[in-house]
């Protein structure tokens, strides 16, 4: 037996740690295939955190057919206009993000909906290069395995829309007292633009800046026909 392998075998604690880390790395890729099944309703790491801390949360799973199309249009135009055309990562956007970072300039988020979904399902919330490096292959794998419709359905059912508010049905009921299927264009656009910072951006009580952003997204959503074909064709 080589000396290096013998050294490793003689340290059972280290061996268990390495195996546990490997299992944690592989587990998300296994779960992606389980999420192909429509009756499985995934939860996010933030939901799990709330459960562990005994905070509780509100999430009511709904199928994509039970969500107003104007909400889907608004979210896509706000968060990922190229959703139907990339394979999980918008590499042109990522390239600009890296260039801005190297120049020391303020950077945009650059996260596609598959990237946000991978982060919400498997990773932590705070920004770091380590998280981003893990997020990219998970996003590509998620986009490859799941259909665009299923991926969007999962995203809209795990996204955070306020403290303890997860998923579009709970968000619509909490902010506007209507089901997700009955959201208006203005309500949908307000929910969409609150996604980057759902704790501070209150869709149900928007300030002037949020209303202005929502107006821009509302207009974009009305002309989004070509951009959403992968969802509704």
Curated annotation (Swiss-Prot):
Q: Which GO terms describe its cellular component?
A: peptidoglycan-based cell wall; plasma membrane
Keyword Cytoplasm in annotation: no
Q: Which GO terms describe its molecular function?
A: pentosyltransferase activity; peptidoglycan glycosyltransferase activity
Offer one example of a GO biological process linked to this entry: peptidoglycan biosynthetic process
The places in or outside the cell where this protein is found are: Cell inner membrane
Q: How does it sit in the membrane?
A: Single-pass membrane protein
Task: Could you list this entry's UniProt keywords, alphabetically sorted.
Answer: Cell inner membrane, Cell membrane, Cell shape, Cell wall biogenesis/degradation, Glycosyltransferase, Membrane, Peptidoglycan synthesis, Transferase, Transmembrane, Transmembrane helix
Does Protein biosynthesis show up as a keyword for this record? no
Pathway info: Cell wall biogenesis; peptidoglycan biosynthesis
Q: What sections of the protein cross the membrane?
A: 17-37
What is the protein's major site of localization? membrane
Family affiliation: Belongs to the glycosyltransferase 51 family.
Supply the name of the protein: Biosynthetic peptidoglycan transglycosylase
Source organism per UniProt: Rhizobium etli (strain ATCC 51251 / DSM 11541 / JCM 21823 / NBRC 15573 / CFN 42)
In the record, what lineage is assigned to the organism producing the protein?
Bacteria, Pseudomonadati, Pseudomonadota, Alphaproteobacteria, Hyphomicrobiales
Per the record, the gene is mtgA
């Amino acid at each position: 037996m080589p000396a290096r392998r013998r050294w490793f075998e003689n340290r059972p604690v280290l061996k268990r740690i390495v195996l546990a880390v490997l299992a944690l790395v592989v587990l998300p890729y296994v779960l992606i295939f389980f999420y192909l099944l429509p009756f499985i309703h995934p939860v996010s790491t933030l939901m799990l955190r709330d459960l562990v801390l005994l905070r509780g949360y509100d999430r009511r799973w709904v199928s994509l057919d039970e969500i107003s199309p104007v909400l889907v249009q608004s979210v896509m135009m706000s968060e990922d206009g190229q959703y139907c055309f990339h394979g999980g990562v918008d590499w042109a956007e990522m390239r600009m993000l890296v260039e801005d970072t190297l120049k020391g300039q303020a950077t945009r988020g650059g996260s596609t909906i598959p990237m946000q979904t991978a982060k919400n399902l498997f990773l932590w919330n705070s920004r770091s290069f380590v998280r981003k490096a893990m997020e990219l292959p998970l996003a590509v794998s998620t986009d490859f395995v799941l259909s665009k419709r299923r991926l969007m359905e999962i995203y809209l059912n795990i996204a955070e829309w306020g403290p303890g508010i997860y998923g579009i049905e709970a968000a619509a009921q909490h902010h506007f007292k209507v089901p997700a299927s009955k959201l208006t264009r203005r309500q949908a656009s307000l929910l969409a633009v609150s996604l980057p910072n759902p704790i501070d951006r209150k869709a149900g009580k928007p300030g002037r800046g949020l209303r202005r952003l929502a107006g821009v997204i509302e207009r974009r959503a009305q002309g989004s026909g070509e951009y959403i074909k992968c969802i509704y064709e």
